[in-house]
């Protein structure tokens, strides 16, 4: 008996030691994954549009013994982050000063100075621009609108509600069609003629991207002939098009107003007593405004001058054959107040934007049982519920259509909605879902394409596919055959989750000029991101 007790005690001790070692390992892993920032670290929250200078900034920091960290986000996302917690950052580099004015606590932002200038313009394939009479001619925004109204011009752009280029292009067009008033007011937004013109403008949208970088990638892979983007991005795109022996774009600078981004670098004054941080900021800002960086940025297609005339520019970058004339003055638009900008964005969502028909294909196979299905239900409720989605400007409007397809080994059920804002019933149906069977991502994708093929071209049409596993039923060949014979331009966006197959989803993305979003770090975040692409 004593011998048995002794064995039992020994076994318990070994288990406890093992548990303690495991706990120690886990603690170490957590520490390594989430290191605390040193107080000496100078952290910059920066627009994704500035990432081309990361290496130069960090190199400067190393040479001057400043430990610089840079975190990149979309411009409108930066506003949300700083509104919720600015204390994690020491400086902000954003595309346009208007977003600094949208902050709830503007007092923490000081010493803001423009680094470079980057207009947002429409660019059209040169042959199409020639056909429209846009070459070597002074063009007004109204003439662009007329080309769209007459069905002669369609274009792709970034999200108005989630990106800087989309928002500023919209505000510029709105301001111009309102007659370029000294101050754009709330009353002006209510004018029927203005709203009618803006609806016509957005009817020309062929596809929307949730970020500017993907917009360029999407254009290169797709069959489009016009785009709204940064001048610098369009210059880089044209260089790629020429390299691929494709037709470059012709940039159009309306004489009645262009959205100009001043790309300010500003200090975040979290602690006025911390003079060390301020000194580091001053050094970095002065470096960004130095002749060395100015020259480098000009080579990348950014302007270092605001309007006016500059003759000594690189003709390979600021190419006159692409419609770029650096000797002409650019008329900047007058941005309205914070209140009017907010009202204008809401007007766009509810009244102006081209309606969308989104088909969600949701995996309810057996591997989604438990936490996976629970997270899916929460994410879909967030996206579909008007009140919660509107907090992030992601809500569907009455004009939109939503279709839900659930699948496992086959297509399980299809839940359509007629009004995008009336989703209570479909949310209820989603929350009653149960898991069953294996995984087949191809058949529901084909079914989604069939639904959208029958939809009017008055809608932007998108498929969003969410899966947590490898497809062991259905065939990519069947999907490819159907797509190439019918759809051709409809994108399928995929959200990965669990052990989903990157290879299979990449095949679908390549076929449909789509994109893959990572849902493994949270489905809600992934659905929020993909929502901005439609």
Regions found by a protein language model. Name each.
Residues 8, 26-30, 305-359, 366-374:
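Acidic, polar low-complexity linker/tail segments
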Residues 33-159:
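N-terminal segment of the mature folded domain
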Residues 121-128, 261-279, 296-300:
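A bilobed periplasmic-binding-protein/Venus flytrap-type ligand-binding module shared by bacterial periplasmic
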Residues 181-253:
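Ligand-binding pocket segment of bilobal, Venus flytrap-like solute-binding proteins
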Residues 285-309:
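Periplasmic-binding protein-like
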Residues 351-416, 418-466, 494-504, 525-526:
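Von Willebrand factor
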Residues 375, 432-435, 467-518, 528-530:
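VWA/integrin I-like adhesion module and closely mimicked acidic/polar interface patches used
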């Amino acid at each position: 008996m004593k011998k048995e007790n002794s064995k039992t005690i020994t076994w318990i001790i070994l288990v406890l030691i093992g548990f303690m070692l495991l706990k120690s390992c886990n603690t170490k892993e957590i520490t390594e994954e989430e290191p605390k920032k040193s107080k000496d670290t100078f952290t910059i929250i920066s627009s994704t549009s500035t990432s081309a200078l990361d290496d130069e900034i960090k190199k400067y920091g190393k040479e001057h013994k400043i430990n610089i960290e840079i975190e990149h986000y979309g411009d409108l996302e930066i506003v949300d982050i700083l509104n919720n917690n600015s204390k994690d950052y020491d400086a902000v580099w954003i595309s346009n000063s208007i977003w600094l004015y949208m902050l709830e606590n503007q007092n923490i932002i000081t010493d803001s100075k423009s680094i470079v200038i980057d207009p947002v313009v429409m660019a059209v394939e040169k042959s199409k621009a020639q056909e429209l009479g846009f070459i070597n001619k002074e063009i007004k925004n109204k003439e662009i609108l007329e080309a769209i109204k007459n069905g002669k011009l369609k274009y792709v752009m970034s999200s108005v509600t989630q990106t800087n280029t989309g928002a500023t292009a919209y505000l510029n067009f709105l301001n111009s069609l309102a007659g370029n008033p000294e101050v754009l007011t709330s009353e002006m937004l209510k004018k029927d003629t203005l709203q009618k013109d803006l609806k016509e403008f957005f009817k020309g949208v062929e596809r929307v991207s949730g970020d500017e970088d993907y917009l360029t990638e999407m254009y290169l892979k797709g069959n489009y002939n016009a785009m709204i983007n940064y001048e610098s991005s369009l210059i880089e795109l044209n260089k790629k098009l020429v390299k691929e022996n494709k037709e470059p774009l012709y940039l159009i600078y309306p004489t009645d107003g262009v959205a100009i981004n001043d790309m300010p670098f500003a200090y975040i004054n979290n602690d006025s007593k911390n003079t060390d941080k301020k000194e580091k900021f001053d050094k970095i800002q002065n470096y960004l405004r130095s002749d060395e960086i100015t020259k480098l940025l000009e080579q990348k297609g950014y302007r270092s001058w605001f309007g006016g005339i500059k003759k000594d520019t690189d003709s390979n970058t600021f190419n006159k054959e692409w419609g770029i004339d650096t000797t002409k003055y650019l008329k900047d638009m007058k941005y309205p107040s914070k209140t009017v900008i907010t009202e204008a964005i809401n007007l766009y969502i509810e009244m102006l934007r081209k309606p969308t028909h989104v088909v969600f294909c949701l995996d309810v196979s057996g591997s989604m049982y438990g936490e996976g299905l629970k997270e899916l239900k929460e994410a879909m409720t967030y996206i579909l519920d008007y009140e919660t989605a509107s907090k992030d400007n992601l809500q569907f409007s009455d004009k939109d259509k939503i279709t839900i397809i659930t699948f496992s080994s086959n297509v399980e059920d299809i839940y359509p909605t007629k009004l995008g804002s009336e989703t209570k019933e479909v949310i209820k149906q989603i929350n009653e879902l149960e898991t069953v069977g294996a995984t087949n991502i191809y058949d529901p994708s084909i079914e989604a394409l069939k639904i959208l093929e029958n939809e009017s071209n008055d809608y932007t049409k998108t498929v969003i596919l969410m899966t947590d596993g490898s497809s062991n039923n259905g065939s990519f060949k069947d999907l490819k055959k159907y797509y190439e014979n019918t759809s051709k331009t409809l994108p399928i966006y995929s959200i990965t989750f669990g052990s989903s197959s990157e290879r299979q989803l990449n095949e679908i993305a390549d076929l449909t000029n789509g994109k893959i979003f990572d849902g493994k770090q949270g489905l809600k975040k992934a659905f929020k991101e993909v929502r901005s692409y439609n």
